[in-house]
Amino acid sequence: MTDKRKDGSGKLLYCSFCGKSQHEVRKLIAGPSVYICDECVDLCNDIIREEIKEVAPHRERSALPTPHEIRHHLDDYVIGQEKAKKVLAVAVYNHYKRLRNGDTNNGIELGKSNILLIGPTGSGKTLLAETLARFLDVPFTMADATTLTEAGYVGEDVENIIQKLLQKCDYDVQKAQRGIVYIDEIDKISRKSDNPSITRDVSGEGVQQALLKLIEGTVAAVPPQGGRKHPQQEFLQVDTSKILFICGGAFAGLDKVIEQRTETNRGIGFSATVKGSSEKVTKGELLAQVEPEDLIKFGLIPEFIGRLPVVATLNELSEEALIQILHEPKNALTKQYQALFNLEGVELEFRDEALTAIAKKAMARKTGARGLRSIVEGALLETMYELPSQDSVEKVVIDEAVIAGQSEPLLIYGKHEAQQASGE
């Protein structure tokens, strides 16, 4: 049977690239004396996409943001913590400048600037690390130090961290080597006592020892996709000296260690400096005075502290800062819920007294910014449950009484009738 063209000729048409006839493909696109099928078009698109992927890292390297630009971007998403943002901006800039220009400059070897973030729960440590990675468009992964153990023990090996990073970038080693790793709860792997113990501390000092080489820089052999189930597969070699490690922790009790040191240095007897009650130093001010010896006394081993040369301290968030966090950043919590309600065609309004009540509640719980979402979620739960079943609601108003649990959110209907969510 002969294929017929629309112009009436009996010539069978073939793709000029793969040679398939017009009956073997879905579409054959004609050009001047040539034809290309839909399959070859798809293949060309794949080739172009791969080329773009390879070119992208070079483009990024040529446009490294300055510390000012990094700090400015952090300001859009993180409220307060000005000193910490400045320290991070400089450290991150220097790290990627080192990668871009090679580890040496005129024969001088440039050291690696891993970062230690010290601050209470909910002060923004994780958010800072996530925002940095997103801005720089580099792979990012998080690990919880409390789940890590030495190799050979029940728990997560430290090298699993690199495996997670590889998973985030589809096992592209070059891309992973430009990534950021955030290790949370690093204070929880402190040594149980000041003196090294004869018994093995596999989740404390043992983990610190295991992390040493990884953080400083080593070539880690990581199993490819499929892991240890396929031992015949060749391991991927990842150079961790190019990965930026950021460690964070609350370090509860560290302020007491610092206070003890500063009190001792102040002297005793007639030469002692007497401090009045009005001169009482805050916890944040104490943490800002942290020295390596304080961290050693807290339980981190000297070698581990040496691998984290850049230290930034974060202050406990005040009530005013929590109110700002609720509505000022680009992805502020209230803006997120307003966008969610907007998908239902409903306007969501948070009154000023409601924001204050949310902040007060979070302060009472001592959870910092981390506790804000659960408070808002609790206040809006019933409304979010009922709203998709109601067609005429135009606006939902949240006030102080709603946050306190004394009343339901105010629902404003299309006919401009205000009713309580309870159905009054």
From Swiss-Prot:
CDD domains, sorted = RecA-like_ClpX
Gene3D superfamilies given for it?
1.10.8.60, ClpX chaperone, C4-type zinc finger domain, P-loop containing nucleotide triphosphate hydrolases
Q: Which residues bind ATP?
A: P120, T121, G122, S123, G124, K125, T126, L127
Q: Which sequence ranges are marked TM in the entry?
A: none
UniProt keyword annotations, A-Z: ATP-binding, Chaperone, Metal-binding, Nucleotide-binding, Zinc
Asked if the Swiss-Prot or TrEMBL record annotates the protein with the keyword Metal-binding, the reply is: yes
GO annotations under biological process?
cell division; proteolysis involved in protein catabolic process
Q: Which PANTHER family match?
A: ATP-DEPENDENT CLP PROTEASE ATP-BINDING SUBUNIT CLPX-LIKE, MITOCHONDRIAL, ATP-DEPENDENT CLP PROTEASE ATP-BINDING SUBUNIT CLPX-LIKE, MITOCHONDRIAL-RELATED
Q: What does this protein do?
A: ATP-dependent specificity component of the Clp protease. It directs the protease to specific substrates. Can perform chaperone functions in the absence of ClpP.
Q: What is this protein called?
A: ATP-dependent Clp protease ATP-binding subunit ClpX
Task: Give the species this sequence originates from.
Answer: Sodalis glossinidius (strain morsitans)
Its lineage opens with: Bacteria, Pseudomonadati, Pseudomonadota, Gammaproteobacteria, Enterobacterales
